């Protein structure tokens, strides 16, 4: 409720003859000094995740930096229902929505929109092994999307050109659940932003990107329609600062830069290896990784040898971590084909690379520089960093150095360096591959932990229906409600 402060100018007391004047001043309930930034969000690998490793995600990191900029604490409030998320913002229960939300006309009418964080395409998603659709007009009734998502807006716009286009909307499933049903063959098609699809292909390689339905959609934060002018001005100032500092580019590279390249066969093989090969060596990775996340060490090992203790290359490197003979001697490995010795030695060498890096490189990025050095040598990595400086780029930012490394293959550039020619593009591919393997390992590890919680203790869950049955039954229920219903123009928009 808006409070009114009545300020009486004591004119009579001051002049002794003037009548009193009453001035009415409106004070917003939000005018009190902010102490907490309440951010509504959705769960998702690129948006917000809270697990044993802590809170991560593009939107989380940006929100955390914004809270620091404001000098307040951050409270992330995850929602599982988009409709409730939007309602919370309208009701001023939260200050901002930071959830990978696409900019649409409907949202622009209801909320204030922050500046663009990044852009995505809306793509049709289908299953590997099924024909790729060529005409959206032939898919009436076969597309399933989330209610209150930008996919509904895309379909509504397409419906103007394809009047018979119909689709299904579900309220109780997110993108990841729809992806899983597509991968199983239980749904035919859905619509997703390109970044979400690329990330989830690392876990569900059966997913395929079909036709692009809408290009370069802006992803933004949402603010309340009223009493948020000050917060919006602060957000704009913060955004300009972060853009100048390269933070947006850094986070885009961190969360999306390594997922652009997708290999169906390789991803399928890796997921099988996690089930069939990794269990024999997991304890060794955990033992020798030390402070390093064991999954990064395991991902590096898979990139090197596909977890084959007897792996051997034409250049003479051998074993799980593909050590050269000089490196093996340096780290105390006598038998490079002994899995435990190789993993221990590889971990020692990788940690040595991390420690040799300049302190100016942040902790979160040191591992990527170290892996590049593991692949082509520390000298070449330092050459790339020096080249970055000469090109007015940041030598401590992996996003910049990964652009420079391929230049070490061009005489124009490597003749300026101390260590000469190097296959820099190979090092970039090497690091990106490890990052993708790591993402998949994290996802599988988290899913395993969730299943352990679900499955134990058995007596508590005796009356529960199998999770897959729940999904099928729920989807069937939704289909009865939404199946091939033609929504009104703009239906499903917040």
Curated annotation (Swiss-Prot):
It is found in: Cell outer membrane. The keyword Nucleus does not apply. PROSITE patterns: PROKAR_LIPOPROTEIN (PS51257). It is a peripheral membrane protein. Its EC number is 4.2.2.n1. The keyword Ribonucleoprotein does not apply. Residues 473-494 are annotated as: Disordered. The active site is at residue 304. One of its GO terms (cellular component) is cell outer membrane. It is an enzyme of class 4 (lyase). In the N-terminal section; belongs to the bacterial solute-binding protein 3 family. In the C-terminal section; belongs to the transglycosylase Slt family. HAMAP family: MltF. This is Membrane-bound lytic murein transglycosylase F. It comes from Shewanella denitrificans (strain OS217 / ATCC BAA-1090 / DSM 15013).
């Amino acid at each position: 409720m808006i409070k009114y402060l009545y300020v009486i100018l004591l004119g009579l007391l001051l002049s002794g003859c003037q009548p009193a004047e009453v001035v009415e001043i409106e004070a917003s309930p939000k005018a009190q000094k902010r102490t907490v930034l309440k951010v509504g969000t959705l769960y998702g690998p690129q948006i917000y995740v809270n697990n044993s490793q802590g809170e991560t995600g593009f939107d989380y990191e940006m929100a955390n930096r914004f809270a620091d900029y404001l000098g307040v604490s951050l409270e992330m409030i995850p929602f599982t229902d988009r409709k409730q998320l939007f309602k919370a913002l309208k009701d001023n229960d939260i200050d901002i929505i930071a959830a990978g939300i696409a900019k649409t006309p409907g949202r622009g009418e209801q909320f204030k929109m922050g500046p663009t964080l990044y852009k995505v395409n809306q793509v049709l998603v289908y299953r590997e092994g099924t024909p790729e659709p060529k005409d959206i007009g032939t898919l009436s009734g076969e597309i399933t999307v989330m209610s209150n998502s930008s996919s509904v807006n895309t379909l509504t716009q397409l419906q103007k050109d394809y009047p018979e286009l119909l689709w299904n909307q579900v309220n109780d499933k997110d993108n990841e659940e729809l992806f899983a049903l597509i991968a199983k063959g239980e749904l035919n098609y859905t619509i997703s932003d390109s970044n979400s699809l690329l990330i989830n292909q690392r876990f569900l390689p059966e997913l395929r990107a079909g036709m692009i339905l809408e290009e370069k959609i802006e992803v933004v934060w949402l603010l309340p329609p009223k009493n948020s002018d000050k917060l919006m001005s602060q957000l704009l100032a913060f955004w300009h600062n972060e853009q100048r500092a390269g933070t947006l580019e850094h986070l885009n590279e961190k969360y999306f830069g390594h997922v652009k390249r997708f290999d169906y066969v390789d991803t399928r093989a890796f997921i099988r290896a996690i089930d069939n090969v990794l269990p024999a060596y997991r304890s060794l990775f955990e033992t020798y990784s030390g402070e390093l996340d064991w999954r990064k060490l395991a991902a590096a090992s898979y990139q090197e040898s596909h977890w084959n203790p007897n792996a051997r290359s034409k250049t003479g490197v051998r074993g799980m971590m593909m050590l050269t003979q000089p490196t093996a001697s340096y780290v105390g490995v006598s038998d490079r084909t002994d899995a435990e010795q190789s993993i221990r030695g590889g971990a020692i060498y990788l940690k040595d690379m991390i420690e040799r890096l300049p302190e100016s490189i942040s902790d979160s990025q040191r591992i990527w520089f170290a892996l590049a050095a593991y692949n082509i040598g520390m000298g070449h990595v330092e050459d790339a960093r020096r080249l970055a400086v000469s090109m007015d780029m940041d030598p401590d930012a992996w996003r910049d150095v990964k652009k420079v490394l391929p230049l070490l293959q061009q005489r124009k550039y490597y003749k300026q360096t101390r260590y000469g020619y190097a296959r820099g593009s190979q090092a970039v591919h090497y690091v990106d591959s490890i990052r993708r393997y790591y993402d998949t390992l994290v996802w599988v590890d988290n899913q395993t932990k969730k299943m352990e919680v679900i499955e134990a203790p058995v007596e508590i869950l005796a009356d529960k229906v199998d999770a897959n049955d729940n999904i099928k039954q729920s989807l069937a229920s939704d289909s009865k409600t939404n199946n091939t219903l033609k929504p009104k123009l703009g239906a499903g928009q917040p």
